[in-house]
Amino acid sequence: MIERGKFRSLTLINWNGFFARTFDLDELVTTLSGGNGAGKSTTMAAFVTALIPDLTLLHFRNTTEAGATSGSRDKGLHGKLKAGVCYSMLDTINSRHQRVVVGVRLQQVAGRDRKVDIKPFAIQGLPMSVQPTQLVTETLSERQARVLPLNELKDKLEAMEGVQFKQFNSITDYHSLMFDLGIIARRLRSASDRSKFYRLIEASLYGGISSAITRSLRDYLLPENSGVRKAFQDMEAALRENRMTLEAIRVTQSDRDLFKHLISEATNYVAADYMRHANERRVHLDKALEFRRELHTSRQQLAAEQYKHVDMARELAEHNGAEGDLEADYQAASDHLNLVQTALRQQEKIERYEADLDELQIRLEEQNEVVAEAIERQEENEARAEAAELEVDELKSQLADYQQALDVQQTRAIQYNQAIAALNRAKELCHLPDLTADSAAEWLETFQAKELEATEKMLSLEQKMSMAQTAHSQFEQAYQLVVAINGPLARNEAWDVARELLREGVDQRHLAEQVQPLRMRLSELEQRLREQQEAERLLADFCKRQGKNFDIDELEALHQELEARIASLSDSVSNAREERMTLRQEQEQLQSRIQSLMRRAPVWLAAQNSLNQLSEQCGEEFSSSQDVTEYLQQLLEREREAIVERDEVGARKNAVDEEIERLSQPGGSEDQRLNALAERFGGVLLSEIYDDVSLEDAPYFSALYGPSRHAIVVPDLSQVTEHLEGLTDCPEDLYLIEGDPQSFDDSVFSVDELEKAVVVKIADRQWRYSRFPEVPLFGRAARESRIESLHAEREVLSERFATLSFDVQKTQRLHQAFSRFIGSHLAVAFESDPEAEIRQLNSRRVELERALSNHENDNQQQRIQFEQAKEGVTALNRILPRLNLLADDSLADRVDEIRERLDEAQEAARFVQQFGNQLAKLEPIVSVLQSDPEQFEQLKEDYAYSQQMQRDARQQAFALTEVVQRRAHFSYSDSAEMLSGNSDLNEKLRERLEQAEAERTRAREALRGHAAQLSQYNQVLASLKSSYDTKKELLNDLQRELQDIGVRADSGAEERARIRRDELHAQLSNNRSRRNQLEKALTFCEAEMDNLTRKLRKLERDYFEMREQVVTAKAGWCAVMRMVKDNGVERRLHRRELAYLSADDLRSMSDKALGALRLAVADNEHLRDVLRMSEDPKRPERKIQFFVAVYQHLRERIRQDIIRTDDPVEAIEQMEIELSRLTEELTSREQKLAISSRSVANIIRKTIQREQNRIRMLNQGLQNVSFGQVNSVRLNVNVRETHAMLLDVLSEQHEQHQDLFNSNRLTFSEALAKLYQRLNPQIDMGQRTPQTIGEELLDYRNYLEMEVEVNRGSDGWLRAESGALSTGEAIGTGMSILVMVVQSWEDESRRLRGKDISPCRLLFLDEAARLDARSIATLFELCERLQMQLIIAAPENISPEKGTTYKLVRKVFQNTEHVHVVGLRGFAPQLPETLPGSDEAPSQAS
């Protein structure tokens, strides 16, 4: 058996009353006896201080401090020490017989706080002969010694061979060594563990039932199921970490998206501005060169325009001088034409008026005759009307006598009266008062003859009148014609003047007949003269344009020379046109090709970027599309190989995970069904019984039990038989072993151990040979070792799987990139570089432009020469036909001569035209001018008198005729008297009156009508006379005006005047047109010169500004380029495809990216400030700084342990691959890590069952413990009802609450807490979080209720409380509980330390005088049975029969206080028999 470690001695150095004292400790009970103040408590305080050197826990209370809320300021330690270095050392020997001295160096710290400095240390390998006091003291003399400080102690021990000295800086390391060497029973990992240990020591020191321990019995007695708890914590931590990692991945993905967005927008923002500045710099350079070329061209154009301006100004001056003369000539010609037109119009008017006068003369004569006839008819009508009136009057007078009209008599009477009236009227008219009816006939003949005579006379006079009137009219006409031709003259001169005019008319008519031939001749000569003048002008212009005077004889030769030159220049111009057309076609083709290439360039550049990225990613160079497709095939093959290897590694990793999961099952069960069967059979798995077997013993026990290592140990096999019937849900081979699970051993088999193997004799005729497994899995230590190796393997496999997954995803992404490249860019990626071709074409275009410019200049000169030669030929073509005119010098004289003759002829023609009609009219009647018919008025009066006489004679004859006709009526004189009342006569008279009145009415109407007609005839006659007189006056005026005009108006005069005017107008128009052209050209030339001057100034200004801008921008651009190259971002910023975008597009792109960046960096102060600074358009380098800052910002956030690159873009690509792999792996891991609620319930139940069994074993050791009336002590362990219900729900009804356990938002602990709250809504959880509650529910100790019960007297079993027990009973019961705790700790910690070490057991009891002798004897027996050491402090009542007793007496000698110690070993005889379960016999008294 393994010997238990023991405390050999306690050494106090420089304590109050103890300078150098060593107390040898008994193997069982050491008693410190002495009076008050003897040093018992100091001694035990030194022991406790060396055991637990934690100033936060140490507090040595005096009994006088009972009820005090706080002790002394030094907590009882400072006052127990003396000044200087103090030591408290424990000399121990462990189960391995190793001597270990542990202790502390104490030293008071000066100050009012009364602090103590403690330094723990340990000494190993010290020989048994060396006493602790010899180590720490140095003898100065026989009665003097010195305490060594810690450093000297260290030096002293290091000088001793084989001795190890360790000084500890932490209490945890100190206690860890003590636990490993078997000095303390439990590993004290934390301050909480130290506190529990101290409370245990303190409870034993002061005795009684400690409320601090009884309230926390679960923490003291029930070991923390660290494996299960750690598994749950690891699972939750792994799940939490998994979910946090997934969340971090999602955040990282969003960060990645943000990074991609940031780098994309930053690249767009800066690259667009970078390329815009690059484009602008190139554009500015091109503009500067263009400005320089335009400046040179403009200067040349300005000089040419100045020369042109001088020539045009000179020509304009000449045309301005000629224009005045032409305007005067034209105005004269226009005036002459107007005069001719006026004269012609006057002549036309004169002729028209003369014709009108002739017509009016004829009409006037006709109208005179009509008027004369109308007058005669008027007179007849008047006579007839008068007769009708007379008859009416007569009838009315006759009718007045009504009686006469009554019968015939009345009629006759009326006739008679009428006859009388007619007779009276005839008397009156004929002036014959003696006229009678009888003499009427005679007188009628007389008067008829008289009428006839008067008529004849009137006709004679009328004839004479007519003849006189004709003669008078002819004379007046002839006289008026002479007056009209010659002007006013005497009537007697008319004849001579008329004859002279007729002779002159003949001469003028002869001259007038020559007008037309002369005019034609003059027109011909004038035309020749004008042609001669035109030829002279053309010759002068030609000479001026040619800049040389030519003779007429030289013109033909010059014409031939110019035609030859035209032919030559025409060929040159034609060839030049063809050449220019060829050059322009080539230029257009180049331009079209350049445009096509510029459209293709961005696509090609994008393809090249993609190809370069692929080349960088795969490290290969591709020269053709075939290389790409071949590499893609290789990539596919590599991807398949990587996938196969990844799947193999993944399968192996899954197998390792499954094995880890299987080995991690509680109790070592690899099959969950075994746990259920063990619970059903009421047994325990064999693996659980051997769960604490060491790693060294695991191969042996694994081989010992062989296939039955997974057996179920049951108390009674006979009770299991009934359960085996119909059992199907079990492994193929189920082993059952009968035995007590609490005291099971390996004696069931007969076994022989061989080298790395065993032979198990199962029966007489059946042996089993089993070799030790290379990887044992029997026992928790073996499983944990295997799990550790599996975890290591899993880490390697996980790393390899991650690497392969990364490679696969990288390969897949590379394959996708290749596929995208093949689909999008393969067709153009391997074509020729369009930019290089564009550069070649641009250089060729420049050459073509230069050739075109030179060609245009040459062609312009040739064209100018051609135009000049052509103009010269044209001028000569117009001049050469007129060479004879140019040689005719007498043409102008002949024109003047003919013009004079024509003037005379025209004058004659005008005279003939003016007076020709008058002369023609005068010629036949000129003879009437010889005599003047002045008696015409007398004849006219005689004619009128003759007409009146003829009219009177006619009336007289008519009246006499009426008398003669009524001559019979004169015989009715008697009837007039007789038939005055006759009615018939009256009626006849009335009828006759009516007829007479009707006749009178007709006569009146005829008279009125004829009078109106006569009036009209007279009006027409007056109108004709008035028109004739008016036109006569107008004709005279027109003739005078025509004479005043002084122009001969013949038929061709107007045409000649118009032709002359039109020719002059054409010349003037041509001159003006040319002058206007010259003025416009001059104005245009001046404007062009002004424009050229302004353009020249502007070009000079723009050129110098542009050159300055280029020079200025060059420095900034150099700085930008230097910054770009220094930071290695040129590849990112110099995006050549952007060079083909316009500045507005690039600015828009940059502005859009700027807006996105403002939002993206809103939370980053540094980037926000750098971005704000980069917005200055005058500082482009700040944008580069911003881009570098973004890159630096992203580089700082690259996980170098995951992504090994400094390029954020590549990091983002790798991040996408890694995040995708991690997401997939963590999702799979989360599914594997998740644990079912039934498994949790089974684990907790198994743990509770195991701990209940262990508590029962502890209770067995306390059955015979008695103190006073207390006959026995036990621990009662029960499962709480609420927690039992939780376990039932977890194992049986978990499907109803899967909403909690399947939630990704809740951890398993939180889901468990939610379920607990759901099942127990009445319980107030307080302020604790679900996570805290869930972690408590995962600890099986919280499911149990523990309390201490004592069997006291007649009360039976009751709860152990201080108030129900006496002091001694309470002390004894508390000591029993403490012993159970220590034993529980040892059991819990057995697997943590070496199997060959049994730890020391030691408790304290201060003021043991409260126990009686029997209780003290019980303590002695308990210590002996449990191999426990006990230190008791009592005044005097402890008899030194057993153990070792020290008598302490405090003395004062020469002002020096010390404690006198006397030791006595026990002398009681040996007991006849030992207590049950004791390992050794009690020591003999000495």
Swiss-Prot record:
- Positions binding ATP in this chain are 34-41
Q: Which InterPro entries match?
A: MukB, MukB/SMC, MukB_hinge, MukB_hinge_sf, MukB_N_dom, P-loop_NTPase
Broad class of the protein's primary localization: cytoplasm
Question: Any one Gene Ontology biological process term?
Answer: DNA replication
Q: Could you tell me which PANTHER family the record lists for this protein?
A: CHROMOSOME PARTITION PROTEIN MUKB (PTHR42963), DUF4476 DOMAIN-CONTAINING PROTEIN (PTHR42963:SF1)
Which family is this protein grouped under? Belongs to the SMC family. MukB subfamily.
Swiss-Prot/TrEMBL domain comment: The hinge domain, which separates the large intramolecular coiled coil regions, allows the homodimerization, forming a V-shaped homodimer.
Q: What is this protein called?
A: Chromosome partition protein MukB
Q: What gene is behind this protein? A: mukB
